[in-house]
């Protein structure tokens, strides 16, 4: 258990949850607020998987086509816009917009790494891990997270997962509880 003002050690929480589950038990965590009310959370592990094409499934021709389109990109805010094209083989990257495709910052940076066979920077490791699982990621801003993560194309169902990188995660239980409340709208 913890007070709402207690700091969170996310690594410790992960280890504790795994230990509890290894004994065949349910990991329940209780947070006590300043009015002495208790909120209980069930903790678990998620291993998202989806149906999106993986980078390794693209043919050399498709990768070359993406490279040609990437060379035509236009900086837009913190992302990129790829103007007028006839086909886009990577549906999990970017969104259609004004006869082109808009890529968010992490999508464009990841695409650049893949197309140019560069070393993956540490800040893209989580994004890459999720891409390797075949999921589709969209901004999670409205839900208090970095990404909302889909196992199917957007619009077929609600996002089954919200993902927040640990370096952006709440630092105390009050902030974590607020994030959970916000995410319930998903």
Kindly label every feature range from the protein language model.
Residues 1-145, 149-186:
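Long Lys/Arg-rich low-complexity intrinsically disordered regions in nucleic-acid-associated proteins
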